């Protein structure tokens, strides 16, 4: 069971880490709340994408052409927007 969890985690990590080479880059990752989304009375739009921090990205943890848009930085990931 532990080996299966490690393999699944590794597969997800590698898929997200190599996502900047993908054509459909905006369709990968998990939606997140950007500061520009703001509080709305009927719920918020999640316009950002959660990116895992890897060595190939800039200091903000976002791929090329994207910028950090969250309220605070995560330890393993950042909320980025194109």
Curated annotation (Swiss-Prot):
UniProt subcellular location = Secreted; Nematocyst
Q: Which cysteines are joined by disulfide bonds?
A: 32-79, 34-69, 62-80
Supply the Pfam families for this chain: Toxin_4 (PF00706)
Q: What does this protein do?
A: Binds specifically to voltage-gated sodium channels (Nav), thereby delaying their inactivation during signal transduction. Causes death to crabs.
- From the Swiss-Prot or TrEMBL record, give the protein name: Delta-actitoxin-Aeq2b 2
Q: Which organism is it from?
A: Actinia equina
Keyword Phosphoprotein tagged:
no
Q: Which InterPro entries match?
A: Myo_ane_neurotoxin_sf (IPR023355)
Q: Name one GO cellular component term.
A: extracellular region
Question: Any chance you could tell me the propeptide residue ranges?
Answer: 20-26
Report the GO molecular function annotations.
sodium channel regulator activity; toxin activity
Q: Which family does it belong to?
A: Belongs to the sea anemone sodium channel inhibitory toxin family. Type I subfamily.
| Keywords of this entry | Cleavage on pair of basic residues, Disulfide bond, Ion channel impairing toxin, Nematocyst, Neurotoxin, Secreted, Signal, Toxin, Voltage-gated sodium channel impairing toxin
Q: Does the keyword Disulfide bond apply?
A: yes
Gene3D superfamilies xref list:
Anthopleurin-A
State the signal peptide span. Answer: 1-19
